[in-house]
UniProtKB/Swiss-Prot annotation:
Protein family: Belongs to the rhamnose isomerase family.
Cofactor binding remark: Binds 1 Mn(2+) ion per subunit.
Gene: rhaA
Organism this protein belongs to: Mannheimia succiniciproducens (strain KCTC 0769BP / MBEL55E)
GO biological process: L-lyxose metabolic process; rhamnose catabolic process
Cellular compartments per GO CC: cytoplasm
Pathway the protein acts in: Carbohydrate degradation; L-rhamnose degradation; glycerone phosphate from L-rhamnose: step 1/3
EC number: 5.3.1.14
Record-listed Mn(2+) binding positions: H260, D292, D294
Claim: Transcription is one of the keywords in the record: no
UniProt KW Isomerase keyword: yes
Protein name (record): L-rhamnose isomerase
HAMAP family: RhaA
């Protein structure tokens, strides 16, 4: 019996003593996919021919060597990251990651431009999620779906429609629904006199985009708000209230991004607030440092609280977990592995909680016992259960994954000059 197995058997007994079945927890964890975001691997550059600079208030900071420059390099880097992460995974793509031998404008994207991604996903037994790309384009400089100019607005509406067909294609090819999330950077740097008209235009544009019914077996629409962005500090057309109302009234999923709110707000508190009103919720788990900085996800209090809300309320089939961070100052594969494994660790810790006992204490208003058990829970050997999970999935246990990342950096990433 290995050291990992010995530690697991001891941990299994300790959790059994408080009524928690570790085998059941591991089985449930296997059913909770994490959607990894492709854009960590190339600093949100994408593969459009003749693409412009990153815009829309999005910034990647740092210049760590080894950034993926081609679809082939990005998929190779993803292969390495996926090999170091246990459990069920998906990949989240932006429209700007299309592949073509000529320039394809945003309103002309087609499923065929993502055939290589579908083949890769099939080979890795992973689902795909999707995002229209409403930034880093000459026609996104002023606004997109809320633009006063109907021609520009129509261009972006066509992009949204085209992306829904790609998302549907993903779902049909891979046998799992693709969640397509709409986020736009539209807003204003300074004071706005007419805030209503852009929002009315956005409503009409979104309605036109989602007018064609697509089977939910293949595709789900989601909409994402933001408090502010660089260059749009004073007014954001797609605010939280706007998209919450839109999702409820139109039956779409709502996306909550951990970095898209005021620094004192947390999305863990918003999950139970919106779930009575929407069927599906998309999460972009991130780490905002004073603003939407998209730092790598930590195993911190908020990540744990997000996981706890999903597990305690058994929202397994209704909440879709995606990651959204991009750090160009560190090894990009390490960033994927750290962030994804941390999200999985948080879910496992939540699955190892004696929730029924805690809820009973809460209902009995025995808050002292509730606090005591929540604190004692932190000292239980969940790490041994996590190590067992990694071993069963044939991925490195503990810090050993870092050795593989360093070796890959030496043999592959260092050659990208």
């Amino acid at each position: 019996m290995s050291t990992v197995q010995q530690a697991y058997e001891l941990a299994k007994k300790q959790f059994a003593d408080i009524g928690v079945d570790t085998e059941q927890a591991l089985a449930l964890l296997d059913q909770l996919p994490i959607s990894m975001h492709c854009w960590q691997g190339d600093d949100v550059s994408g593969f459009e021919q003749g693409a412009g600079a990153l815009s829309g208030g999005i910034q990647t900071t740092g210049n760590y060597p080894g950034k993926a420059r081609t679809p082939q390099e990005l998929r190779a880097d993803l292969d390495k990251a996926v090999s170091l992460i246990p459990g069920k995974k998906r990949l989240n793509l932006h429209a700007s990651y299309l592949e073509a031998d000529h320039r394809v404008d945003r309103n002309e994207v087609k499923p065929e431009h993502f055939a290589n991604w579908v083949a890769w996903a099939k080979a890795n037994n992973m689902g795909l999620d999707f995002n229209p790309t409403y930034f880093s384009h000459p026609l996104s400089a002023e606004a997109t779906l809320s633009h006063q100019n109907k021609e520009i607005r129509d261009f972006w509406i066509e992009h949204g429609k085209a992306c829904r067909k790609i998302s549907e294609y993903f779902g049909k090819e891979l046998g799992t629904a693709s969640v397509m999330n709409i986020w736009i950077p539209d807003g204003s740097k300074d004071f706005v006199v007419d805030k209503f008209a852009p929002r009315q235009r956005l409503v009409e544009a979104l309605d036109e985009i989602i007018a064609e019914k697509i089977d939910a077996k293949y595709h789900l629409d989601a909409v994402e708000s933001k408090l502010f962005g660089i260059g749009v500090e004073s007014y954001t057309v797609g605010s939280n209230e706007f998209y919450a109302a839109y999702a409820v009234s139109r039956g779409t999923a709502l996306c909550l991004d951990a970095g898209h709110f005021h620094p004192t707000e947390v999305i863990s508190d918003k999950i139970s607030a919106v779930m009575p009103f929407v069927q599906h919720l998309l999460l972009h788990v991130s780490r905002p440092v004073r603003w939407d900085s998209d730092h790598v996800v930590l195993l911190d209090d908020e990540t744990q609280a997000i996981a706890g809300e999903i597990i305690r309320n058994q929202l397994f089939d209704r909440v879709h977990i995606g990651l959204d961070f991009f750090d160009a100052s560190i090894n990009r594969i390490a960033a994927w592995v750290i962030g994804t494994r941390n999200m999985q660790k948080a879910l496992l810790r939540a699955l190892l909680e004696p929730t029924d006992e805690l809820r009973a204490l809460e209902n009995a208003r025995d808050f002292g016992s509730r606090l005591a058990l929540l604190e004692e829970q932190k000292s239980l050997p969940w790490q041994a259960v996590w190590d067992m999970y990694c071993e069963r999935h044939n991925v490195p246990v503990g810090r050993r994954w870092l050795d593989e990342v360093r070796a890959y950096e030496k043999t592959v990433l260092s050659q990208r000059v």
